[in-house]
């Protein structure tokens, strides 16, 4: 090859390499610009339309680093959109309940600064469970704890902690309340907080940390709500509220709330005569509540809520083994599914039950007269057959020698089904334990299991003689 041919060949190769490098630089530039603009867009699986990432609530923010020819490109991966909960999965099949959590608040109060509380409950967001209670504006080892047996004072606030964390001095006070309910719609927490004068109380609706709506007393007689979790389906949350006599006719209404705003109010309808302190759970596409009849019945009222058309129906749990306290003994107690049984109906205690086909799972105090002990069991035909009394799978949660109190339900969504859990309030102090001047509680929590389980008793466990007076 002569010198001229060499020069031409080298020049051609150099030109080819230069062209390839130029095209690569253009490709890198186009890729960089494309990825820069695409980080603010993501595909919506619902309708295949491009949706902006920035205004959506995200669960996680992942940055993926891509290396191209010594050029670093940061690509933001659009996260999964947070959606409203719809609770459409089936209810888990269970054989009974297994221990889940216990906060030991009273025992810890003997040597630490723990809030005086009552009316506890549990509710979960999509990732974590929390315990709530109504604080008395004081810790136990504090003279302000004297005479905290009273339910309604302006210093009471709703407390919120991660489940299993006692209400210490650093606990968040969510709102002012002597009656409350809380639930998570999949995007944010809703808190319903009642406080004020007995004859003119106010319910505040706090959503995502902001007060959005309110409603005043409609019967001027202690406006009150569930003292356990409300339920949200597809962005609509339902809460049962009562205003009126605690031992006679009262005005119960079901409020429908969307992102903290009241969108509809339905009156109670059906055959229930008195409804208070409902324990509610999702029963897709609606909500079902098991409540307290403080007037006529020791059998528990059932309230069925249609979230789509706002209609309400009510009845009573069919089981002849009734759930309220006080009550008749099991041999003489009755329930016909439709009406209060007129058996020791005046007074009562918050409780829970839930349907399982034609059967019913329920919890109640072991004592038929006092808030002592706690048991759970399943009643065959207890949801569909009047006065059914065939009991199976009984468990003792708190032995009969120890105090209990309110109890309620909460639901946890798993990968394939919705599990039912319950808590029991373990009251200590006045009125029964007169050595001390305070009244407070701890809690124990159980959840449904499809496995096997053993036996035991999980009382509060504090020695009252070691407690501050």
Swiss-Prot record:
Activity: how regulated: Inhibited by the neuraminidase inhibitors zanamivir (Relenza) and oseltamivir (Tamiflu). These drugs interfere with the release of progeny virus from infected cells and are effective against all influenza strains. Resistance to neuraminidase inhibitors is quite rare.
Active site residues according to the UniProt entry: 151, 406
Compartments (UniProt record): Virion membrane; Host apical cell membrane
Region of interest (Head of neuraminidase), residue spans: 91-469
Positions of disulphide bridges: 92-417, 124-129, 183-230, 232-237, 278-291, 280-289, 318-337, 421-447
Protein's membrane topology: Single-pass type II membrane protein
Listed InterPro entries: Glyco_hydro_34, Sialidase_Influenza_A/B, Sialidase_sf
Quaternary state and interactors: Homotetramer.
Name assigned to this protein: Neuraminidase
């Amino acid at each position: 090859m002569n010198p001229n041919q060499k020069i031409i060949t080298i020049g051609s190769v150099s030109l080819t390499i230069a062209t390839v490098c130029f095209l690569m630089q253009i490709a890198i530039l186009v890729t960089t610009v494309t990825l820069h603009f695409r980080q603010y867009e993501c595909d919506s699986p619902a309708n295949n339309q491009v949706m902006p990432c920035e205004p959506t609530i995200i669960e996680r923010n992942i940055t993926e680093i891509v290396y191209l020819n010594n050029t670093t490109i940061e690509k933001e991966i659009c996260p999964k959109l947070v959606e409203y909960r719809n609770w459409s999965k089936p209810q888990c099949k269970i054989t009974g309940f297994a221990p889940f959590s216990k906060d030991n608040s009273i025992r810890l109060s003997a040597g630490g600064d723990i809030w005086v509380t009552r009316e506890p409950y549990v509710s979960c967001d999509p990732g974590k469970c929390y315990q709530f209670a109504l604080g008395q504006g004081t810790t136990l080892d504090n003279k302000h704890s004297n005479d905290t047996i009273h339910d309604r004072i302006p210093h009471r606030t709703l407390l919120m902690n991660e489940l299993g964390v006692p209400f210490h001095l650093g606990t968040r006070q969510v709102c002012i309340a002597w009656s409350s309910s809380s639930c998570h719609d999949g995007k944010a927490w809703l808190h319903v907080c009642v406080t004020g004068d007995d004859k003119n109380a106010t319910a505040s609706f706090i959503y995502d940390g902001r007060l959005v709506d309110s409603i005043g007393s409609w019967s001027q007689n202690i406006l009150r709500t569930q003292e356990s979790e409300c339920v949200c389906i597809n962005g609509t949350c339902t809460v049962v509220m009562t205003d009126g006599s605690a031992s006679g006719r009262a005005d119960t209404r079901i409020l429908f709330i969307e992102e903290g705003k009241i969108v509809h109010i339905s009156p109670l309808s059906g055959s229930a005569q008195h409804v208070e302190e409902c324990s509610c759970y999702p029963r897709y596409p609606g909500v079902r509540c098991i409540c307290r009849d403080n007037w006529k019945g020791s059998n528990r009222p059932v309230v069925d809520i249609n979230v789509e058309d706002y209609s309400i129906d009510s009845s009573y749990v069919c089981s002849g083994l009734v759930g309220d306290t006080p009550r008749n003994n099991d041999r003489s107690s009755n329930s016909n599914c439709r009406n209060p049984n007129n058996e020791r109906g005046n007074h009562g205690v918050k409780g829970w039950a839930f349907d399982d086909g034609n059967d019913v799972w329920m919890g109640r105090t072991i004592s038929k007269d006092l808030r002592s002990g706690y048991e759970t069991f399943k009643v065959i035909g207890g949801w569909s057959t009047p006065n059914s009394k065939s009991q199976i799978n009984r468990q003792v949660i708190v032995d009969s020698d120890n105090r209990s109190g309110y109890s309620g339900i909460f639901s946890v969504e798993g990968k394939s089904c919705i599990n039912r859990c319950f808590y029991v309030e373990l009251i200590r102090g006045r009125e029964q334990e007169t050595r001390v001047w305070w009244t407070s509680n701890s809690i124990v929590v159980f959840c449904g299991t499809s496995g096997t389980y053993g036996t035991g008793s999980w009382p509060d466990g504090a020695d009252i003689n070691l407690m501050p007076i």
